[in-house]
From Swiss-Prot:
Presence of keyword Ribonucleoprotein: yes
Any Pfam family the entry gives: KOW
Protein known as: Large ribosomal subunit protein uL24
One GO process term, biological-process aspect: translation
Signal peptide: none
GO cellular component terms, A-Z: ribonucleoprotein complex; ribosome
Summary of subunit composition and partner proteins: Part of the 50S ribosomal subunit.
Key words of the record: Ribonucleoprotein, Ribosomal protein, RNA-binding, rRNA-binding
Function: One of two assembly initiator proteins, it binds directly to the 5'-end of the 23S rRNA, where it nucleates assembly of the 50S subunit. One of the proteins that surrounds the polypeptide exit tunnel on the outside of the subunit.
Family: Belongs to the universal ribosomal protein uL24 family.
GO molecular function terms attached to this record: rRNA binding; structural constituent of ribosome
Length: 104
């Protein structure tokens, strides 16, 4: 079970985008995350009339390593860590500071 999953609200704790918040769009296999509106890079694309792509300079999100982000706890309005707890025979994710379920 992963500590950070798709659609989690996160905050960047290190790097050029430190302090920015966003939602996880994609979780990649090598402990990297694509976060909406964070770590934007410019990519030069060729026009492709067959696919309807105009071409030019496009801004898109680049992956960040999971060690540079922390899950955002809406209750405390701070970055938090994730722990695990077994309730009713199921393993759930909980915030370390409040011990409340992340997915609640």
């Amino acid at each position: 079970m992963q500590k950070i999953r798709r659609d989690d609200e996160i905050i960047v704790i290190a790097g050029k985008d430190k302090g920015k918040r966003g939602k996880v769009l994609k979780v990649l296999a090598d402990d990297r995350l694509v976060i909406g509106g964070v770590n934007l890079v410019k990519r030069h694309t060729k026009p492709n009339p067959m696919a309807g792509v105009q071409g030019g300079i496009v801004e898109k999100e680049a992956p960040l390593h999971a060690s540079n982000v922390a899950i955002f706890n809406g209750e405390t309005n701070k970055a938090d860590r994730v722990g695990f707890k077994v309730e009713d025979g199921k393993k759930i994710r909980v915030f370390k500071s409040t011990q409340k379920a992340v997915d609640a």
